[in-house]
Amino acid sequence: PGQLSGGEQQRVAIARALAKNPKLLLCDEPTGALDYVTGKQILKLLQDTCRQKGVTVVVITHNSAITPMADRVIHIKNGTVESMQCNDHPASVDLIEW
């Protein structure tokens, strides 16, 4: 693993987590070490996993531009829930730009 780049390590970690077929997948900045194209591919994979396999995917991010893909958005500030919104029509990752 030490010979892999940060982005490669991140992709391997996500692949290992998905291989376990979890009911809940917690992703802290899943695109943080990735380029734009690979980041979109990973987000698409996570969205498809959620929709097709019924896995609950929690994405923690500072990138508010990706919130349209979420079913629910929870904003936390200083450890306190600041707001919570439900999104009845989540956008496809393909339509999101940042």
Regions found by a protein language model. Give the residues of each.
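ABC family nucleotide-binding domain
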Residues: 1-69
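Glycine-rich, phosphate-binding/catalytic loops in enzymes
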Residues: 44, 77, 91
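Conserved catalytic segment of ABC-fold P-loop ATPases
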Residues: 69-75
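Conserved beta-strand-loop-alpha-helix hinge in the C-terminal portion
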Residues: 80-98
